[in-house]
Amino acid sequence: MAGKAAAPGTAVLLVTANVGSLFDDPENLQKNWLREFYQVVHTHKPHFMALHCQEFGGKNYEASMSHVDKFVKELLSSDAMKEYNRARVYLDENFKSQEHFTALGSFYFLHESLKNIYQFDFKAKKYKKVTGKEIYSDTLESTPMLEKEKFPQDYFPECKWSRKGFVRTRWCVADCAFDLVNIHLFHDASNLVAWETSPSVYSGIRHKALGYVLDRIIDQRFEKVSYFVFGDFNFRLDSKSVVETLCTKATMQTVRAADTNEVVKLIFRESDNDRKVMLQLEKKLFHYFNQEVFRDNNGTALLEFDKELSVFKDRLYELDISFPPSYPYSEDSGQGRQYMNTRCPAWCDRVLMSPSARELILKSESEEKVVTYDHIGPNVCMGDHKPVFLAFRIAPGAGKPHAHVHKCCVVQ
């Protein structure tokens, strides 16, 4: 009997990865990371693939330049990617510009079997056919094939120099036009501050920034199309509720700094059982005695505390999460499943979509399961973030009724 034919339609793979750690220990981590990434490519065999990276180049971009070049070269020329004969790479390497630098890197790969792929020129306001492999870096501001913005400094005044922002590209694949937005939102600067209120002050800052991005991508300047927003949203569990749940029967001890009287540590102890310490909380310490709670059943019992997306429920959709929190994993190359005791584990890395993009995916979901939302490298050290991906198919003809609207056929 002949082998089963591949599912019809155009296979799409969207991956988000905060890769800051990879450039701090390139020898060990990059090899692992690339092997696991290639495995996902091999499994899902996408025709169109997007990889959105945050903290590209690590904490010190200047020192990591050679590692960056090597990583990009490896991705573009590796054996695993040899069937992808067209590529676009956009790297924000302008690290000397506090005003503009976002440390975002966006990679787009097109399979040789894929015909007629177009990318939108935001300046000329028309689609252009994608040919060859091109890398753009340094000043992305002058590249007409994308829009890049860094969030205004007053969004996060505590942070002297934040690199948070977003990059948007627009594509036409299989007669479907969509925006792909690479995003990096603000983190929780202090566990103690995050614990004080529910929702936390930080979630309010992320809410404001994400609202700004969504307003930008559907404003009047360009025709509205479906969109996928994927990156490091830095969404955190509602800290106050989590601590109350994890430490229901605990008593709390407050430790203050002798000179300022400022709270520097909270210690939660069991009321009995020799007053065993359950949780220690400091600005950058979240040490819970039993990490298994974040791994049992992939941590899904904690999803009730993952509330930040609910504000956008009419504008952003997400498939059900069935993988464990994607951050903060140990950066020890021998530890693949261990979390660091720095933050409460959370689903920071996500692939979100507009309601119309959701329709596109659901149209494609036939009797066979062709949609997968998961993380990469569950048992291998991938750095402090596990990459997260969405694999789906655009069903044949899914975009046809709209083909005349977004004028994919009117190209240069």
From Swiss-Prot:
S-farnesyl cysteine lipid attachment residues: 409
SUPFAM superfamilies listed in its UniProt record: DNase I-like (SSF56219)
GO cellular component terms, A-Z: dendrite; plasma membrane
Regulation: Inhibited by EDTA and 2,3-bisphosphoglycerate.
Compartments where found: Cell membrane; Cell projection, Dendrite
UniProt KW Transmembrane keyword: no
Keywords: Cell membrane, Cell projection, Hydrolase, Lipoprotein, Membrane, Prenylation
Reaction it catalyzes: 1D-myo-inositol 1,4,5-trisphosphate + H2O = 1D-myo-inositol 1,4-bisphosphate + phosphate; 1D-myo-inositol 1,3,4,5-tetrakisphosphate + H2O = 1D-myo-inositol 1,3,4-trisphosphate + phosphate
GO molecular function: inositol-1,3,4,5-tetrakisphosphate 5-phosphatase activity; inositol-1,4,5-trisphosphate 5-phosphatase activity; inositol-polyphosphate 5-phosphatase activity
GO BP terms: negative regulation of phospholipase C-activating G protein-coupled receptor signaling pathway; phosphatidylinositol dephosphorylation
InterPro entries on file: Endo/exonu/phosph_ase_sf, INPP5A, IPPc
UniProt PTM comment: Isoprenylation at Cys-409 is required for localization at the membrane.
Positions of transmembrane segments: none
Principal location listed in the UniProt entry: membrane
Propeptide: 410-412
Entry-linked Pfam families: Exo_endo_phos2
Membrane topology: Lipid-anchor
EC number in record: 3.1.3.56
EC top class named in words: hydrolase
PANTHER family, alphabetized: INOSITOL POLYPHOSPHATE-5-PHOSPHATASE A, TYPE I INOSITOL-1,4,5-TRISPHOSPHATE 5-PHOSPHATASE
Subunit structure as annotated in this protein's UniProt entry: Interacts with TASOR.
Function: Phosphatase that specifically hydrolyzes the 5-phosphate of inositol 1,4,5-trisphosphate to inositol 1,4-bisphosphate, and inositol 1,3,4,5-tetrasphosphate to inositol 1,3,4-trisphosphate. Plays a crucial role in the survival of cerebellar Purkinje cells.
Similarity field: Belongs to the inositol 1,4,5-trisphosphate 5-phosphatase type I family.
Protein name: Inositol polyphosphate-5-phosphatase A
Lineage of origin: Eukaryota, Metazoa, Chordata, Craniata, Vertebrata
